[in-house]
């Protein structure tokens, strides 16, 4: 539901002539969940979805809304024609699905609105088109609908678990949905959940020989673990301003021999040979993994991020050893967060 929120509310609005967020919250939530089941989950019979939704609304204090919920959901089933193998962004009668297929609709629900068809806010879509053009923007938007797989990798001296599927890049594996993630990581602690594109950024520094390394904005420690695997003899420190993520980092730190600097403690007393700055960004390169990013990717948000990124880079340079190396990384595809930062720093 989260991933397809805007597409679902557009369809519900078309079927009901009502704005979903103005409905009583339990009624709107029921319609969203039921519509997602009708459009995206093929194994659940329509009558089961509708009966369950109506029954839930009745039992949870909204008996007067049962007729409305029933009518809207039945209208949605009548809007569907057939599932076609390949959906097309821009076809107003296509409800796109994550596997590339689409429900062909009997009415033009998404007329002139690729943004709503793919689940982007209007401001985010405007930014996407401005930066990349409508054709590429549509390709990016369609790609964001798919549910991204969980990908793992291991240090060079370890093999991937037998339970994972081979990725196109032999260093990585795709975790099947039936594998217990907790057991997987407990059995192999140095395993990392990491995409190839994220991991590959550290390939730029793997031939260096740094004595002291700092990972700023370390999050839960994914790149920190990778740094330890690359540089087993280096002193490695990490920082993370978010309390929740830093708690995970602190739990990991003893296992990989990393110092975690806290906001209320003394920082480093010596400069670093290598500083890794994987900075907060718009997540525009990972829309499929961060569905919420499609709602906030606009000029105002990008401008605030660019300012924050510049501050982090300036701080990073201030603790960098003379002739040291600074690795700047984002998971954004927006030029303002990437190449445009180079002249400033």
Which residues does each PLM region occupy?
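Class I Rossmann-like S-adenosyl-L-methionine
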Residues: 1-179, 228
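Rossmann-like S-adenosyl-L-methionine
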Residues: 166-345
